[in-house]
Structures are given as structure tokens and as C-alpha cells.
Amino acid sequence: MPRPPVVARTLPALRRALDDLRRRNATVALVPTMGALHDGHLSLVRLAKRRAAKVVVSVFVNPTQFAPHEDFGSYPRTWKADVAKLAAENVDLIWNPDVKTMYPEGFATRIGVDGPAIAGLEDRFRPHFFGGVATVVGKLFLQVRPDVAIFGSKDFQQLRVVTRMAADLDLGVKVIGAPTIRERDGLAMSSRNVYLTPEQRQVAPTLYRAMKETAKLLKAGRSAEAALAAGAKMITDAGFALDYLEARHAESLAPVGSIKDGPIRLLVAAKLGNTRLIDNVAV
């Protein structure tokens, strides 16, 4: 039987648990999550175990990164299953605060983000999002004080924003991006995939196929404008409502015009019915 992780729900309990973990100067890795864990999350946990002696997983559905019309209330919450999965991975500590612990009455301080990493893409459609992400991740870093933190590359713009924030604010955390984990048909694993109907689930992998085709055209020398137009047509022809398909510099996230401006990352967001999916691939 796997050893159940310690669960902390208050800051004093978290500090006591962290003091125990850090005996003999053990290194600590943090994997921030919103729960509803799948194999993609567990791949982050496994990478964390390779990068540090002790692993902390936070499970907190952060209300400040949801707009009023988004799915905060219906976001999947699978606590018992999450704990069982983390126990099977021998996670040392689960940090599971409630909203009042993270945002007590009178809370008035937020982290703002700026620069090319936030320009366009998700910020255009969810202007509240990265302020909420930066604030909650900044708090998690200060609460846990990990040596390393593991984030999935599926949320690539988020990864770049968090990496920049940790460096700019001298938080002393090494942010590591882990590869996107995909289903056999190429669909990126996501907690929101449960919203897809069976018919939509059959269509959803088109998003990944369209990005691969766009990358192929870029590598063949087509301009970003032409390659992106071809990829966008594949996506909309499949029934998606496309928010964006863009080619950006993989480090700065500045827009690019051709393969010569690389390294390039393709980033996409589109809605299939009521479900919004995001993904990205390297070129």
C-alpha cells in the first residue's frame, strides 16, 4: 500500500510539514495544480521527483484566474481520486488551502505582468488571467519556498510568464517546463477534456494535426502568414471557433514572420462547442 501524503490546509500546518521535509537540507519541488489530476499532472510529479528529494503538490482552484462567465463553479473537483493518485506516486505533501486562506478578508495586493510574453494570445481573450496566475503562483512560491517548480508546457504562455516573474522578483525558484502529455490520437491531456461530448472528442485532435501541418509548412519555407492561414482553415473546417493560431518566438513570445526568426512556437486556442482548448507545438 502506498504511504498517504501529508495534507496541509492551513499555513501553520504547511510550515510544520515543510520543516519536517527540509530536515537534513532536503531539496523541495513544487507542482502547482488545480486538481482534477490526469496523467499529464502525474508526469509533472515524476519529473519533480527526479529534480528534488521531496515533492509538494498544491491543489487549489484559483478563483482570481477565472472571469465571471468562465467555469470556476463547474471546474472538475475530484479530491479523493486526486489524493489516491498522489499517494500512488509517493508525493510527500499536498497543500490544499481554501479561498479564505489564500485570499483573506482585505486582501489587496496583486502581481502585475507586462512585456511581450503577455501581449496577445490568452491575454487578448482572458485579460484577467495572468494577473490571477502570477499572484497565486507568487504566493505559492513564497509559502512553500521550493527549490524548483514544475509546470506543464501545454500552458506555454503561462510557463513563460511564470518563469519571467520568478526571475524578475528574485524568488529563488528554478521554473522547469515539462513536455505536454498527449492522448494516443494527439489531443493534449487537460482537465477540461471531460466537458467534450463523444462526438466532439473525435474532432478535438484536429487541433494538434493542424498545428503539425502548420509547422510542416513553416519548415518548408512558407511565410508565417500563409502557413497560419492554412492551419486556421483546417481548424475552422473541423467545426472549431478559433480564438487564435499564432507563431511566436519560443523564448520571448514576440511575433515572428518566418522560420528564419526562430526558434518558433505555434500556439492555438479554439472552442469546440462550449469547451475551450489550448495547445502548442515547437517548430
Swiss-Prot record:
Official protein name in the record: Pantothenate synthetase
Family in the record: Belongs to the pantothenate synthetase family.
Lineage: Bacteria, Pseudomonadati, Pseudomonadota, Alphaproteobacteria, Hyphomicrobiales
MF terms (GO), sorted A to Z: ATP binding; pantoate-beta-alanine ligase activity
Enzyme kind, highest EC tier: ligase
Encoding gene, per UniProt annotation: panC
Residues the record marks as active site: H41
Catalytic activity: (R)-pantoate + beta-alanine + ATP = (R)-pantothenate + AMP + diphosphate + H(+)
Binding site for (R)-pantoate: Q65, Q158
Quaternary structure annotation from Swiss-Prot or TrEMBL: Homodimer.
Species of origin: Rhodopseudomonas palustris (strain HaA2)
